[in-house]
Amino acid sequence: MSHWVTGTFATCLLGLPLVGTAQTSGPPREPQSSLEAIVVTGSYIRRTDTESPSPVDVLTSDDIAKRGLTSIADVLHTLSSDNSGTLTSNFSGAMAGGASGVSLRGLTVDATLVLVDGHRMATYPLADDGQRPFVDIGSLPLGIVDRVEVLKDGASAIYGSDAIAGVVNIITKKQFTGFEASTDLGSSSKADGLAQRLSATYGFGDLGTDQHNIYFNVEYRHQAEIKQEDRGSYLNQLDLRPYGGSDLRGGIVQGDPGTPAYTAVGMVAPLDRSGALPAQGYYLLPGCSAQNLNYSGGCTWDPNLYKKIQPRSEGLDLTAKWSQKIGDRWTSTLALSMFQSESEQWRQPNQYLDGTTLVPFVWAGANGTLVDQTNPATTQIVLPANSLDNPFNPASPYFTGAKAYYGAGFANYVGKAALFYGALTDIPVQITKYRTQVYRVVEDLTATLGDWDTTLSAGFVDAQTRITYTGFVRASALNAALADGTYRVGQNANLNSPSLYQTLAPETHDTAISSLAFFSANASRPLMPLPGGDLAIAVGADARLTRLNNPGEPYATVGDIAMDGSFYAKGTQDVYSAFTELSAPVLPSLEMSAAARVDRYNAAGTAFTPKFGIKWKVIPQLALRGTFARGFRAPGIAESGNSSAASSTFAPLDPARCGAGLPSTPTDCGQGYVAVLSTANPNLKPEHSRSYTLGLIFEPVHSINFTADYFNIRRTNEIVGAPLDPSQAVRAAQAPGTNYPGAILYYATPYINDSASLTSGFDGELRSTFSLGALGYLTAKADATYLIESTQIIDGTEYHYAGTVGPTALSGATGTPRTRGSVTLEWSYQPVTIGATLNYRSHMYGVDPSNGPVCLQLTDPNPNCYVASFTYLDMYAQYRVTPKILVTGNVTNVTNRLPPLNTATYGGTNYNPSLDQPGAVGTFFQLGVNYRY
């Protein structure tokens, strides 16, 4: 399949332009001088030629409607340049749950700047992986979008921090007159995942003739859930033995009998403070039904019963825009918006093992000192010696069975407490619900003052995310209930009172807030005539004030619940900037540009970023272009403010406790999990980048446009978590009478500037329209991105991620495919338009180079160790019933292709939701109607 797809792309990108030249041309273009001068994303200077020195993709509202895309997130995730680190709301374990982010060039969501009408938005109140700030593209309305411009080039010299990989500028309608309503209704071929969208816009007045225009828009979206268990093949099962893998269902013992597993009824072992276990290991408590008692000696339960391929989501957006002429020179534009979105994450039942520390991470005072807790709670569950569920208690009904299991050595365990290892499937499943409201007010004043085109802007954006947690067990409440016998495990779990669960796992809430206030002023004018046009200059300044307050889940912040992926952040960030830009058409065929910007941060210091561009029209049909830019990203509040994030990871070997003669545990010897507390560092420096692009624009005839661009980005001073060093870990107290240190409780690792990365590749894009005479028009579109290199350098060691499933530590282990792209063929004849789009993602080798040349578990059931490529077909049609009514139809994943098996990712189960979601959803049908009056 991948060879055929490669051939298809080669044909479309190289052969179609030649086919187009043989067709009848459409009407000629107007002379360039008659075109209106506009501002293209990446510059503050007006121009008539939309092909600038920097590569810019433009997606119009018509393009979006044809594809049946119903959200900005859907639009941006179809970009071929969106790669590793991209974030979708389908990632059930995301720290930034309920949100979506775009990652141009695979440089993560914090390296892509998202603008609305050229202005910044407040970042989502929850940071990606507890660290990276980003704008939630899933909450932005689609009904008022005129176009989306994607600048695939560094632009810090124009826009400041975060624009290392590029800029997404969502441009809304400048004015609207009349009434327009549209509705879309969709469902999968399995009659689930129902999607609804309603949008209505009303406007009156004309800015040119009436001196004003006012329009209002309301948009509603709803998407029903799709359960994992309702899909076929490996999507709805964790027993992957038929596919050459292992049985990963809950309760399967993955080793010798007695090896602990998260069984449905639990397993126990005598509590020995030295860490030693009996040779027989853990004993399975009675209570497992005959159908769940499995071949491995465990008790099966199915995690897929709780998982969602697509969570339920809902959104409501309200927008008003008032444009008013003020005298002969000034125009005022006031935009008011409220965006509301709701989503949820379903996790698995609470699972407990013997020992991961529940790290407290509340802050004390303004100096950012962590609250000290010398005896933190852990995920270790201990059944007291007198518990009736403890099989080492002679009064327990399990005593006889345990005695038979352990044999002659059982007498040594009688009367001891017991370690419990298992899944508490009787307690309601963990669910996190997100309700985000974004309020935005922006005022733009524009005027032509003499030769200066001037813009003054001010705005305020406030994003609030209310989070509701259910099903998360408090360690203190659980241990208390075990101690007094009110909570039972094993076959006695059915004796628990439903009211007890409200004490063990109460519903809790917190509200995270992110806000942005800004003021900006910029002006541009021609300076002097040059042979190719006017030398033009732009100057400007802006000020921004950012606030973030995420208090965290109230029990997680004091280390009382096991919530891998919880975090706390609070702080402010102020920045003041000044910039200038020059555009010099030195010859009719040669354009040069330069820009420079200075940003002053209250904590990160001062950054100076220049940019240079050149475009040379070699012949009328061929132009060459290139850019060179410096960029930077200031540390976010979650990285440098009063903040911390708790998670767990594979434990490194502890040489102080893992060795001959030491009473080590599996965790001491690198065979378990350990808690990690990532802490902020106020001394962080900004990340810096150097980027350049080299490209060509080829237009053999007016109906064909082909662009190809090489990009190369080197980022230094990257902000990462410090390595796990056992000598710096937080340990338990040394046991009396011993000469070795206590066990590691957790690692407290600050963020540091410690890595660099290099990303390079090619973008190719083709647009070709040619006449079929009386049969209408045929349009061919193709775009692709090929990654040559995606390398991270840490302590001098290079890790090459391009074409692999790594880096697995990033945003749900999205992976880094070398190639993404699509090919579209569209036929239009009078009121009818029919098209098809072939989407492609290349295969990925099943290794994470940072973990060594080892095939990650079950990435593929064959010895080649790779995740297969994914190709799927979409089709769409439009019929203009009357000049006022347009009917649309779309089918996504027409052939119902399954996504490739991928167990390296933890963003989804057995597939990659960030890149292959249409495969998991399956064939999806959508019908829409648009009415315009």
Predicted regions: what they are:
Residues 73-120:
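Extracytoplasmic beta-strand/coil segments of soluble accessory domains associated
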Residues 119-152:
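Short acidic/polar hinge/loop motifs at secondary-structure boundaries
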Residues 129, 233-239, 277-313, 319, ...:
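Surface-exposed, low-complexity loop segments enriched in small/polar and acidic residues
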Residues 212, 329-332, 451-454, 535, ...:
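Repeated loop/turn-to-beta-strand initiation elements of outer-membrane beta-barrel proteins
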Residues 788, 839-851, 855, 878-933:
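C-terminal beta-signal and adjacent terminal beta-strands/loops
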Residues 647, 780-880, 895:
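C-terminal beta-barrel architecture of Gram-negative outer-membrane proteins
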Residues 72-75, 79, 100-103, 135-138, ...:
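N-terminal periplasmic accessory domains that precede
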Residues 1-78, 105, 199, 203-204, ...:
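N-terminal Sec signal peptide and the immediately downstream disordered periplasmic leader
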